[in-house]
Each structure stands twice: as structure tokens, then as C-alpha cells.
């Protein structure tokens, strides 16, 4: 589990939430509960995934792209252009948030997801 333990260790530039003892304890616990084989698969998947190519332009369903402004791997400068490639996608940029947006700012993510559900329901009614 050591190769991913850095997710539980705050660094300069991390969100306020990620620097709290509660976040550190929660994330450390979650990581320690994982099967090492599953973590190895996750690492291989992350580094071996292909580029998206033209896939985003083919998405026609209501979509949501969420990004934490402090996310080192998928921050708004990466995710906003992705959202712009998806017709009708909503983009949410969460201030003072890193990679674990649903853990760091659960209320913001929940509101965004509820909004997406309403958009899906409206699309179904109008189909």
C-alpha cells in the first residue's frame, strides 16, 4: 500500500481539508484496508490508460465534470477543456479542493450531482 500512501499525506498546495487530522486518518484507514493486488491494478490502470481521443465529442447525455482547483492531476486547466468538448456538459470548479472532491467537499459535490440528476430527468421527459 506504500506506493499510494502519499494520497493520505498532505503537502504544500493541498486543500485545507486534506491537511486536517480527520482527513489524514480517514484516508490512511481506507488505504490500509485495500487489497494490495487491487492497489497494484489501480496503479497500472492509471499509468496505462489511453488518451480520450474524440470520445468526449460523442457524448450526448447530460454530463457533469467536477474539478478541484488544487487537484495536481486533473485541475480546472485540464478538466474545463474536457467539459467544453462535451455538448451541454456542466463544469464545476471547487475552490480549496484537491483530487478527492467528494471527500473534501461532499455538500458541493452532492448539489452538483443532484443538479445532474434533475437534468437527466428533464431530458428523459423531453425525449
What are these regions (language model features)?
Residues 1-58:
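Conserved alpha/beta-hydrolase catalytic His-Asp/Glu region
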Residues 23, 72-78:
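Conserved alpha/beta-hydrolase "acid-adjacent" motif
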Residues 27, 43, 82, 109, ...:
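Hydrophobic "lid"/C-terminal helical patch
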Residues 31, 71-74, 98-101:
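Glycosyltransferase donor-binding loop in the core domain
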Residues 54, 77-81, 104-108:
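Generic recognition of short, well-ordered alpha-helical segments
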Residues 56-60, 84-86:
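Short, conserved loop/helix-junction motifs that constitute active-site signature segments
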Residues 58-59, 65-67, 71:
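Short beta-strand/loop motif that positions the catalytic acidic residue
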Residues 87-127:
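Catalytic active-site module of serine/aspartate enzymes centered on a nucleophile-bearing elbow/loop
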Amino acid at each position: 500500500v506504500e506506493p499510494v500512501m502519499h494520497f493520505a499525506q498532505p503537502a504544500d498546495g493541498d486543500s485545507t481539508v486534506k491537511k486536517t487530522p480527520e482527513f489524514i486518518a480517514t484516508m490512511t484507514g481506507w488505504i490500509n484496508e485495500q487489497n494490495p493486488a487491487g492497489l497494484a491494478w489501480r496503479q497500472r490502470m492509471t499509468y496505462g490508460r489511453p488518451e480520450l481521443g474524440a470520445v468526449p465529442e460523442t457524448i450526448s447525455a447530460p454530463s457533469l465534470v467536477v474539478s478541484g482547483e488544487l487537484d495536481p492531476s486533473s485541475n480546472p486547466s485540464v478538466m474545463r477543456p474536457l467539459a467544453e468538448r462535451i455538448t451541454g456538459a456542466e463544469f464545476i470548479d471547487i475552490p480549496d479542493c484537491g483530487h478527492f472532491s467528494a471527500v473534501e467537499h461532499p455538500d458541493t459535490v452532492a448539489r452538483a450531482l443532484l443538479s445532474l440528476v434533475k437534468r437527466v430527468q428533464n431530458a428523459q421527459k423531453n425525449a
